[in-house]
């Protein structure tokens, strides 16, 4: 009995040790402890390779032991690792991506025609049950009728964003929505242009523009300021001023004086500092403070006074910087000569001392100047006017006209252009740009459109004209017409109106033929109604037959229905939502 009682007790720890397969911690000897400490010191100094965890990453030897040691409940094998200090993947929250957003404008189309298992017994939708249905309870549910099944509601996704995702103001933005605003502004501009064109047409029809164009004062540019046309325009401008506030929209300014739409946009053509010189060895740009102290054009050989930006060092020489530097220099010189003053310790004392020094210095210069003039003379030379005023006036007589042209006297010098002028190359007798045709510039001497081509003279003109004639004959194109004057356009418009009046007279004669067309349409509609009734009867018979015994529609005719057939279909169609549907069926 005693042996039997001891065996199971002694067997229990043995089986437990086999299952755990763990070795008991052994006590380290003094030699092992010393070797371990030496190895740690070598790793800290970099003479020995660092420990590597199970993922192949190096473990920093400077990490304390209480951080790097693995607890027994995480890894009983006690392998070197820092996995227990890192965030565990199973505890990390899963956030939605930045591109996900709620769907808008989802169309709910009733596509299903058969009741589905698990759907709502009342309406037939799959997204809810009968007790959660918002539709009016039917007398006979969709489960038993199988008709008029409601569409499935669109369930929005449950989005969970992180800190940045919740504050992303552009998440879910659709750029196509902005096109609606663009179209609205385009319609407003089009309406304004049509109003302006209509007013011009009215003035043209009344003959005001023609009289103004043919008047001799208009040809010589001597128009009276208080003319009738200007009065009319001023009155129209006053009327437009009344409604300018109604026409004004955000982003626009309706200028009634000039009759144009002015965009309230600020044109900024400034260049970023780091884009002025793309050479990486040029001036250093600090992105944190957005400062570039040195001149970016220093290596380009440009004069700092000619460039628009020469670095931020100019700030050091603006404001009170120069005066403060002069005060500091005065403090150092005064301290060397025995005066105990300091810019930071005694700023008020130093400022008063420096002001008195400047006053005494100016008085000393004046006394020195007066003593020299008394001794040597020459005061009359100092009283002369400044050099800027010596050549400011002239006695040359010049007479101008009211247009600004010189009538008599010396003509003013023409402002020089920044481009090269009167440069004739490659044997040309005219400059580049002296000839223009069909949107292209060229040389007038040879009609050549290539800038660096050699001059061919009259032979080049003849060759260009012959090529144009050959191209026109081959393509059958007519030569470009000359632009018409306003008078010619007005005459063409009157001719078109006469043609329209003649067409209206012909249309009245053909009104008698329209009665016959109505009778034919009525006959076609009657035939289409009879055909539609026959089709509905055929469909009713087929629906009463079992679904598996219905015939195939393999030889069904597919063609576009006529207008009479569509009208008959609309007249015979039954609408279940119509309250008069039961009476119409009778």
From Swiss-Prot:
Record key words, sorted: Acetylation, Cytoplasm, Isopeptide bond, Metal-binding, mRNA processing, mRNA splicing, Nucleus, Phosphoprotein, Spliceosome, Ubl conjugation, Zinc, Zinc-finger
Motif window: Bipartite nuclear localization signal: 129-169
A Pfam family that the UniProt record links to this protein: Slu7
GO cellular component, as recorded: catalytic step 2 spliceosome; cytoplasm; cytosol; nuclear speck; nucleus; small nuclear ribonucleoprotein complex; spliceosomal complex
ZnF region ranges: CCHC-type: 118-135
Extent of Basic residues compositional bias: 498-509
Location of N-acetylserine modifications: 2
Residue ranges of the region described as Disordered: 1-102, 206-254, 496-586
Acetylation as UniProt keyword: yes
Subcellular location: Nucleus; Nucleus speckle; Cytoplasm
Chief localization: nucleus
Residues in cross-link Glycyl lysine isopeptide (Lys-Gly) (interchain with G-Cter in SUMO2): 349, 408
Residue(s) carrying Phosphoserine: 215, 227, 235
Bias type Acidic residues, positions: 235-248
Disulfide bonds: none
One example GO MF annotation: pre-mRNA 3'-splice site binding
The keyword Translocase appears for this protein: no
Domain writeup: The CCHC-type zinc finger is required to retain the protein within the nucleus and prevent its shuttle back to the cytoplasm via the CRM1 pathway.
Subunit and interaction comment: Component of pre-catalytic, catalytic and post-catalytic spliceosomes. Associates with the spliceosome prior to recognition of the 3'-splice site for step II, probably during catalysis of step I.
PANTHER family the record matches: PRE-MRNA-SPLICING FACTOR SLU7, STEP II SPLICING FACTOR SLU7
Family: Belongs to the SLU7 family.
Function: Required for pre-mRNA splicing as component of the spliceosome. Participates in the second catalytic step of pre-mRNA splicing, when the free hydroxyl group of exon I attacks the 3'-splice site to generate spliced mRNA and the excised lariat intron. Required for holding exon 1 properly in the spliceosome and for correct AG identification when more than one possible AG exists in 3'-splicing site region. May be involved in the activation of proximal AG. Probably also involved in alternative splicing regulation.
Protein name (database record): Pre-mRNA-splicing factor SLU7
